[in-house]
A protein has these predicted regions:
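Subset of Sec-pathway N-terminal targeting signals
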Residues: 1-37
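Flexible, glycine-rich loop/tail regions that form catalytic "lids" or insertion modules at the edges
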Residues: 52-62, 69-103, 145, 153, ...
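Active-site cores of enzymes that catalyze phosphoryl transfer or operate on phosphate-rich substrates
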Residues: 155-177, 244, 248-308, 605, ...
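Active-site pocket-lining segments that scaffold enzyme catalytic pockets across diverse folds
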Residues: 176, 180-240, 543-547, 555-574
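Cofactor-binding active-site loop characterized by glycine-rich and histidine/acidic residues
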Residues: 216-381, 385, 587-642
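Conserved phosphate-handling catalytic cores of large alpha/beta enzymes
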Residues: 359-370, 378-414, 418-424, 432
Length: 800
């Protein structure tokens, strides 16, 4: 169609009318032109109702993923919920007439499906015996990862008959063990697992599956409920020894005060068919619920570091919580907060919440302000799996999925098993006094292994095979009752602790360091790279430190501490310092990390002393005492060769971690045969900052001292601190060391040391002041700041 010149609109309109009436009057080119014109302007016909329903289906799918857990059948004591107002079809503008209509939903496992098929998948995945909270997770990759693995199998495990029989066998072992103890040792406390027996196949599944995923170490912390069952069936503690403890005739492997049988720790190397072996460790713990949690995390962190790259996938922290404690104990939030903090990451902790729906006699409404006991964990944006404790297969599936998530994303994960407690808080308690209706329902529930056996029989498993498995377990228990206890190996001082001496001896090892060596190290740690922009005041501080060592006098507290660290690091002793603001130091005296004033990059002078030195770790901690001190205590249990220090911001605040001090630091040796070389720095002194910033309560720590369980010191000079820190790793034994550190003395000109005192001296329990001993008429015993106050008063009074 050749067009020359401009065409008037009027002419085009006339041609268009002709084409509409008699198109054959126009040329083929103009006919094609007007056909294209009309086609381009025809609005597509859209079924608005169908589009609205398609959008509604997408919203419905999202809502089930988000809220399906609210109607999941997870409580074995309550009828299953049938519906929820927010999941009703009418809310989305859908009705029964749409059930057979085919939809093409977005972000769904199948390209197309009827609404009925979509609902079936969603209800089976999110509303059966597993309820999942995961849509709060902000990372879309994590959400998609979970959806892909849940919806494709409808949240059901793919188990063959041998797998199911293995689950049954573990249930039988768990239930029959408790029944046997109840019968043979009537009235004795054991804090039965009955009602929550699903925990045993869960743990067995976790151990086996973890091994296949590359885990070599599982470090576990748990309270008393079900602990004996776990020791017997997961840690393979000899049944003979457990029964002997009930008979009170088991000889301890060490001399000490001991502890009740459901507080003791254990360890075992378990062989796993086809996957090698895995080391299991159960941390000893007191009755203080959840206090062991940060200890376990610290132990795992130390093992991660020890293994090097890839260590986080090899070591799995496993914490077993009760529902009331998980919601009620503040240490839970503190431990969760450590999860992704630099220097404290655990690689993801597996949290198992055994929810028996009661805390001693307290019901959930009085135990928490949230719908779920686990709601505090959502602060980490992690998935929470709620599982019916009477569906062991669902428990196994949730465990496998949760563990795979942890290995994939290095994040914490929570599995809550909702169950019940068949007896009272302990076996001598009558729960019907306070929960009569609940315990009437519980009395009607058969044991879980019987429920699951019936399920297998319905699916075609031979009943005689099930009976044979049960008889095998019963025979094993009877034989163990009559057998002699197995000799216990000395578990407290093995492996990395084998070279550590259990008994305390009054050693005074050589802690002095050659003066020339001290000068060399000082030059290195006070000379940052030329390209590093040091704050002018810090540059002057480094210069003063260098001059003090060079001139041989005026070595202050921060300088002596840094020299103690430096000498140990170059002697292959790793050093870790942790606490609030400890990199700089609360009182601006340390500066273990320098900050470039132009780009904010960090430089750690102690990390660049010489090639091949031991590593230095200095971390500002979260604002917590109990979790961080517990973490560092656990870390120290794995590193007897290192110097591990926790510093309180002020010594007054250490009582926020009193449970760690009382139950672990002061008592672990005599109770559990466990040692620690942890050092606590507690700033102490009346410097006019009020009653909460003045006293670390020396008297409290002294009252905890007995039978050489720990050391308490208040060094009065920088040289004394230098020797005390070095002595801590030079002695052949390990005991916690509490050091009351100064405040004003950090810059007091009189409180300095000479180079000779570092190069020739050693730690002394008693220091003699200046003056002629023959002229002394009055003797004053004092320490720390008091000495310098008295010295100044003496000088002012011009008294000798």
């Amino acid at each position: 169609m050749a067009v020359t010149g401009n065409l008037s609109p009027q002419w085009l309109e006339e041609q268009y009318r002709i084409w509409k009436a008699t198109p054959e009057q126009l040329s083929d080119d103009w006919q094609a032109f007007f056909e294209g014109f009309d086609l381009a302007h025809q609005a597509p016909t859209v079924d608005r109702d169908l589009a609205a329903k398609a959008s509604a289906v997408d919203s419905l799918i999202y809502r089930y993923r988000d809220l399906g857990h609210l109607v999941a059948c997870t409580d074995p004591l309550s009828p299953c919920k049938q519906d929820h107002p927010l999941l009703n079809l009418a809310v989305f503008g859908l009705d029964e007439g749409d059930l057979e209509r085919t939809f093409y939903p977005l972000r769904y496992p199948q390209q197309s499906a009827t609404l009925r098929e979509i609902l079936d998948l969603l209800r089976e995945t999110y509303c059966s015996t597993i309820g999942v909270e995961f849509m709060h997770i902000q990372d879309p990759d994590q959400r998609q990862w979970l959806k892909d693995r849940m919806e494709t199998v409808r949240n059901r495990p793919q188990l063959n008959e041998p797998d199911r029989l293995d689950i049954l066998r573990t249930l039988q072992k768990a239930t029959l063990f408790e029944a046997f103890l109840h019968k043979k040792f009537l009235g004795q406390k054991r804090f039965s697992l009955e009602g929550g027996e699903a925990m045993i196949p869960l743990l067995e599944c976790l151990v086996v599956h973890a091994t296949s995923l590359g885990v070599t170490d599982v470090v576990m912390g748990m309270a008393h409920r079900g602990r004996l069952n776990v020791l017997a069936n997961i840690f393979q503690k000899p049944l003979e020894n457990i029964f002997a403890e009930f008979k009170d005739n088991l000889e301890l492997a060490f001399v000490g005060d001991g502890d009740v049988k459901y507080h003791k720790g254990s360890s075992v190397d378990r062989k796993i068919d086809g996957n090698g072996s895995i080391h299991l460790s159960l941390a000893a713990n007191p009755s203080h619920l959840e206090a062991v949690d940060p200890v376990v995390i610290g132990k795992c962190r130390a093992r991660h570091i020890g293994y090097g790259p890839g260590g986080r996938k090899r070591v799995l922290p496993l914490l077993v919580h009760g529902d009331a404690a998980f919601a009620g104990q503040g240490v839970i939030a503190e431990v969760l907060n450590l999860s992704q903090v630099d220097g404290y990451q655990s690689g993801g902790t597996f949290h198992l919440v055994l929810n028996n729906q009661i805390g001693f006699t307290t019901e959930p409404a009085h135990a928490r302000s949230t719908l779920y006991a686990t709601d505090v964990a959502k602060m980490l944006m992690i998935p929470v799996f709620h599982v019916n404790g009477e569906d062991p297969e669902a428990v196994v599936h949730a465990t496998q999925l949760a563990l795979e998530y942890r290995q994939q994303f290095a994040r914490d994960v929570v599995v809550e098993v909702i169950c019940y407690r068949r007896y009272g808080h302990n076996e001598g308690d009558e729960p019907a006094f306070t929960q009569p209706l609940m315990y009437e329902r519980i009395r009607q529930r058969p044991p879980l292994h019987e429920i699951y056996a019936e399920r297998l029989i319905k699916d075609g498993v031979d009943p005689s095979q099930i009976k044979a498995l049960e008889q095998e377990t019963a025979d094993t228990l009877e034989l163990a009752l009559e057998a002699e206890p197995v000799n216990q190996r000395d578990v407290g001082f093995q492996a990395k602790w084998a070279k550590v001496q259990r008994e305390y001896t009054p050693d005074q090892p050589k802690t002095a360091v050659d003066a020339e060596r001290l000068r060399t190290l000082t030059d290195k740690m006070t000379s940052p790279p030329a390209t590093f922009h040091v704050h002018p005041k810090i540059a002057k501080l480094l210069e003063r430190r260098r001059e003090a060592v060079s001139e041989g006098s005026g070595i202050d507290w921060g300088n002596a501490e840094a020299l103690a660290f430096a000498t140990l690091l170059t002697e292959q002793v790793p050093v870790r310092l942790s606490g609030q603001d400890c990199r700089r130091g609360t009182f601006n005296h340390r500066h273990a990390a320098l900050v470039d004033q132009e780009n904010a990059q960090l430089y750690f002078p102690l990390a660049f002393l010489e090639k091949g030195q031991a590593p230095i770790q200095v971390y500002n901690s979260i604002l917590s005492e109990v979790a961080v001190l517990g973490f560092e205590y656990g870390y120290s249990m794995e590193t007897p060769e290192g110097l591990n220090i926790w510093e309180a911001q002020f010594g007054d605040f250490a009582n926020g971690a009193q449970v760690i001090i009382d139950q672990f630091i002061s008592g672990s040796g005599t109770k559990w045969d466990r040692s620690s070389g942890l050092v606590m720095f507690l700033p102490h002194g009346y410097e006019g900052q009020g009653p909460e910033h003045s006293s670390a309560r020396i008297e409290r720590y002294l009252s905890l001292c007995a039978e050489h369980n720990m050391q308490v010191a208040q060094p009065s000079s920088p040289a004394q601190l230098f020797h005390l820190l070095r002595r801590q790793v030079k002695v052949p034994w390990r005991r916690p060391l509490i050091i009351f550190t100064p405040k004003s003395l950090l810059r007091l000109p009189a409180c300095t040391s000479t180079l000779d005192e570092l190069a020739d001296g050693r730690f002394a329990n008693i220091l003699q002041g200046p003056g002629d001993a023959a002229e002394i008429q009055r003797l004053l015993l004092c320490t720390g700041k008091v000495y310098y106050d008295l010295l100044a008063a003496k000088q002012d009074a011009k008294r000798d």
